[in-house]
Amino acid sequence: DEADVAALRNALFHDGKIDSGLVGKDAPVIVEAAGLSVPEGTEVIAIKINAIGKEEIMCKEIMGPVVVVKSYDTFENAVQMACDNMNEAGGVGHTAGIFSNDDAHVRYAAERIPVARLLVNQPTPDAWGPTTNSLSPAVSEGCGSWGNNILSANVDWYHLVNVSTVAMKLDCEPSDGEKLFK
């Protein structure tokens, strides 16, 4: 109900930012912080929302077992909502997920959602690159120029190694800019 959603919203976010004390906590801890209760053994909290983007803070990254659910009319509408939400609430360049066995839907989403990783039929926390997908195991996930990062790949150990390159002068004529850029 809307009162429960409001309580969770107020527990999870303060002044527009996630409550760092609830990041990574189990569902019962989050629910208790909101002054609510759930049956014993609850692992995931699903919240139905009516708005996206700037209008709904629950659309921001929560980093906990909270799933935000929003209805849509058509698949194309859902993809547009995902794009709008990322542009307004944050996450551009990071990761999106789609659960579909329709290759046309996967392609449609991949061509439109501005992310470095689109995970298909798997949870988005798997963007770090476990052995269950083809992504490189990451210490961090680059968001590319979409997210003001230099990389749009998973940041791996080799990105953290300093490399010195020795460049010797070539014994050749300089390139002719006129010919090169015609």
Model-predicted segments: where are they?
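Flexible, acidic loop-helix segments that line cofactor/substrate-binding pockets
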Residues: 1-28, 57-61
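Conserved C-terminal structural/oligomerization subdomain of aldehyde/semialdehyde dehydrogenase
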Residues: 36-182
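Substrate-access "cap/lid" subdomains that shape
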Residues: 31
